[in-house]
């Protein structure tokens, strides 16, 4: 039995017609799933009983099982703990803005990158999510909250470019006008920097936004913060980003988590401005959020000084407004709960 949420539009049409159904039946099914949030064929009343029975034999539509939900008293940010069909768990977040609703979704159970300031990496890595499991996060949040998500950031648990095929396919599904119908420029992939995949992304014809989690201006410091840097140096990553920009023309966001006494020195700001010189970028400065590690935020004065140096050197920069930290839903705070090994 196939997970219908794993299928692209073209694949679903092919599957439906191979069963002897008319092509337009695929559109009817997708309207039920993506617009009405119905995942039971028996409720799809514009399909005949015979067709419903046939579809039930061949497809499942597994939304996610909600284990827990926490709502921030500060800003309404909502964090969801989901159970997957194999018993593993992931977290997703819904963020509310005056003009939009953004979903922060996961691409892996755990994360193999193990950034020292990120709770997800502390829990280890179990497996990649399927395309359907990535898509189901959006549908399950929309059904639970009865609200339409307009923006998606691939910034939850996991490194999206280490689950490349499923990440890209899920984006095509979420963007398709008869499926998720989310504008492509409203979708952002965040990566610590996998050079060959960044270059491959430029060839996909997907005009998504790209965010690079850099966090340090030198390899010496980044090796300590992002262990994967020992495999892919800052120079290799930024070279890939430059190739990406030449091919797409798109501005790239640089994510920089600021940690007191580690990467927040004035010299760090000057070096960061130097390595990003002449690039079409925007820097998001993120004061570190509390996790199990004893890492401290810089002072407000230091944050402003860091930002000022970037601006003085022609680098656009802003200090990100924190959302959901009181429920551990902010940057770097998502973690695995009740891990069950699939081995």
UniProtKB/Swiss-Prot annotation:
GO biological processes: rRNA base methylation; tRNA methylation
Coiled-coil regions listed: none
Pfam families, per the entry: Radical_SAM, RlmN_N
Localization terms from the record: Cytoplasm
Details of cofactor binding: Binds 1 [4Fe-4S] cluster. The cluster is coordinated with 3 cysteines and an exchangeable S-adenosyl-L-methionine.
CC terms in the record's Gene Ontology section: cytoplasm
EC number: 2.1.1.192
SUPFAM superfamilies: Radical SAM enzymes
InterPro entries: Aldolase_TIM (IPR013785), Elp3/MiaA/NifB-like_rSAM (IPR006638), Methyltransferase_A (IPR040072), RlmN_N (IPR048641), RNA_MTrfase_RlmN (IPR027492), rRNA_lsu_MTrfase_RlmN/Cfr (IPR004383), rSAM (IPR007197)
Annotated binding of [4Fe-4S] cluster, by residue: 111, 115, 118
Cofactor requirement: [4Fe-4S] cluster
Catalytic machinery residues: 91, 331
Record domain Radical SAM core: where: 97-326
Catalysis: reaction(s): adenosine(2503) in 23S rRNA + 2 reduced [2Fe-2S]-[ferredoxin] + 2 S-adenosyl-L-methionine = 2-methyladenosine(2503) in 23S rRNA + 5'-deoxyadenosine + L-methionine + 2 oxidized [2Fe-2S]-[ferredoxin] + S-adenosyl-L-homocysteine; adenosine(37) in tRNA + 2 reduced [2Fe-2S]-[ferredoxin] + 2 S-adenosyl-L-methionine = 2-methyladenosine(37) in tRNA + 5'-deoxyadenosine + L-methionine + 2 oxidized [2Fe-2S]-[ferredoxin] + S-adenosyl-L-homocysteine
Binding site for S-adenosyl-L-methionine: 158-159, 190, 213-215, 289
UniProt-listed SMART domains: Elp3
Disulfide pairings: 104-331
Keywords: 4Fe-4S, Cytoplasm, Disulfide bond, Iron, Iron-sulfur, Metal-binding, Methyltransferase, rRNA processing, S-adenosyl-L-methionine, Transferase, tRNA processing
NCBIfam families: rRNA_mod_RlmN
Family: Belongs to the radical SAM superfamily. RlmN family.
PANTHER family in UniProt: 23S RRNA METHYLTRANSFERASE, RADICAL SAM CORE DOMAIN-CONTAINING PROTEIN
Note: Reaction proceeds by a ping-pong mechanism involving intermediate methylation of a conserved cysteine residue.
Function summary: Specifically methylates position 2 of adenine 2503 in 23S rRNA and position 2 of adenine 37 in tRNAs.
Protein's name according to its UniProt entry: Probable dual-specificity RNA methyltransferase RlmN
Classification of source organism: Bacteria, Thermotogati, Thermotogota, Thermotogae, Thermotogales
Gene that produces this protein: rlmN
């Amino acid at each position: 039995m196939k997970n219908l949420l794993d299928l692209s539009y073209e694949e679903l049409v092919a599957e439906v017609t191979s069963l002897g159904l008319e092509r337009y039946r695929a559109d009817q099914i997708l309207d039920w799933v993506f617009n009405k949030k119905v995942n039971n064929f028996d409720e799809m009343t514009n399909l005949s009983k015979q067709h419903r029975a046939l579809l039930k034999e061949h497809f499942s539509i597994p939304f996610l099982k909600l284990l827990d939900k926490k709502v921030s008293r500060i800003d309404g940010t909502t964090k969801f703990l989901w159970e997957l069909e194999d018993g593993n768990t992931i977290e997703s977040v819904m963020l509310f803005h005056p003009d939009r609703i953004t979903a922060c979704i996961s691409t892996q159970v755990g994360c193999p990158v193990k950034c020292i300031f990120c709770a997800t990496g502390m829990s280890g890595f179990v497996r990649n999510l399927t395309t359907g499991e990535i898509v189901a996060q959006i549908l399950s949040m929309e059904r639970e909250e009865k609200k339409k998500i307009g923006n998606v950031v691939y910034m939850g648990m996991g490194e999206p470019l280490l689950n490349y095929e499923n990440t890209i396919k899920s984006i095509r599904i979420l963007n398709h006008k008869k499926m998720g119908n989310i504008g492509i420029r409203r979708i952002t992939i965040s990566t610590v920097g996998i050079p060959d995949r960044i270059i491959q992304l430029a060839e996909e014809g997907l005009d998504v936004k790209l965010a690079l989690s850099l966090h340090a201006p030198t390899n010496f410091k980044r090796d300590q913060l992002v262990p994967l840097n020992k495999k892919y140096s800052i120079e290799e990553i930024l070279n890939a980003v430059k190739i990406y920009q030449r091919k797409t023309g798109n501005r790239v966001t640089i994510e920089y988590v600021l940690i007191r006494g580690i990467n927040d020195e004035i010299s760090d700001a000057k070096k960061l401005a130097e390595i990003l010189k002449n690039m079409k970028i925007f820097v998001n400065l993120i004061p570190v959020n509390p996790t199990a590690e004893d890492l401290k935020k810089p002072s407000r004065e230091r944050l402003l000084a860091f930002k000022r140096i970037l601006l003085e050197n022609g680098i656009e920069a802003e200090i990100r407004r924190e959302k959901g930290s009181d429920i551990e839903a902010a940057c770097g705070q998502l973690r695995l709960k009740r891990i069950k090994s699939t081995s």
